[in-house]
């Protein structure tokens, strides 16, 4: 589970002619950690933002990076190409002329060697269309996310204690009690999912099957096994 940042990237409509009644400015941000929002949130965003934030909170980068359409780039219709692609499109390498200015403001697709990490949503005011990016920026240590957060931190601490540990050996560093009696059970597949989260959030690097901590400090370090006072 992830801490989510939403940031106003642009107004896709005509904010020069119609005001944003919430007073948003480019660069304004708000956050969600699974329990609380922080920052100013216009009610005109609720309908569009909740599915995006929910998916990003649960899946992090995985919410967007495997959407194949994100890597398609620009196309133009070309029926002669149907014998190749089955649909009749041809890649375009620049924005066609004669389009409204807002189309020219659209950023290019991610480079072919980078996976998409952000999603987006817009406000309900079609005159201004405030467009926010949405991305996972950290593991969530909110109380709702604690069971999974603690599992992730326990894995990180095993890697910190033994830099260069083989990824396949990490699970064996936990006792039977630690693996099977603490919820959620630390199964091989859960460890794999948590490792991906640690890598995505830049806590861990994996090189040639070996894991190394990056030195990034997590938002908190729970004292696992000790009662809270």
Predicted regions and their residues:
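Short alpha-helical segments that sit at the start of domains
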Residues: 137-164
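Short, cationic-aromatic polyanion-contact patches
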Residues: 206-229
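Short, Lys/Arg- and Gly-enriched loop/turn segments at beta-strand edges
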Residues: 37-48
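Short acidic, hydrophobic short linear motifs in intrinsically disordered regions
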Residues: 164-183
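Short, structured beta-strand/loop micro-motifs enriched in basic residues and often containing a Trp
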Residues: 2-15
């Amino acid at each position: 589970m992830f801490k989510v940042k939403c940031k106003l990237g642009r107004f896709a409509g005509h904010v020069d002619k119609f005001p944003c009644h919430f007073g948003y400015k480019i660069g304004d941000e708000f956050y969600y950690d699974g329990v609380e929002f922080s920052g100013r949130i216009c009610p005109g965003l609720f309908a569009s933002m909740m599915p995006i934030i929910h998916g990003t909170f649960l899946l992090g980068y995985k919410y967007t990076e495997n959407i194949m359409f994100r890597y398609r780039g620009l196309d133009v219709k070309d029926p002669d190409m149907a014998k190749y692609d089955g649909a009749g499109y041809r890649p375009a390498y620049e924005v066609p002329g004669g389009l409204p200015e807002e189309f020219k403001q659209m950023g290019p697709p991610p480079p072919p060697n980078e996976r998409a990490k952000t999603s987006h949503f817009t406000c309900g005011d079609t005159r201004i269309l405030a467009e926010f990016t949405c991305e996972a920026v950290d593991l969530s240590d909110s109380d709702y996310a604690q069971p999974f957060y603690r599992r992730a931190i326990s894995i990180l601490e095993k890697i910190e204690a033994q830099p260069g540990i083989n990824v396949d050996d990490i699970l064996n560093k936990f006792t039977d009690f630690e693996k099977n009696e603490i919820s959620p059970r630390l199964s091989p597949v859960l460890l794999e999912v948590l490792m991906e989260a640690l890598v995505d959030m830049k806590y861990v690097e994996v090189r040639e099957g070996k894991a190394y901590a990056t030195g990034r400090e997590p938002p908190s370090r729970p004292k696992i096994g000790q009662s809270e006072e």
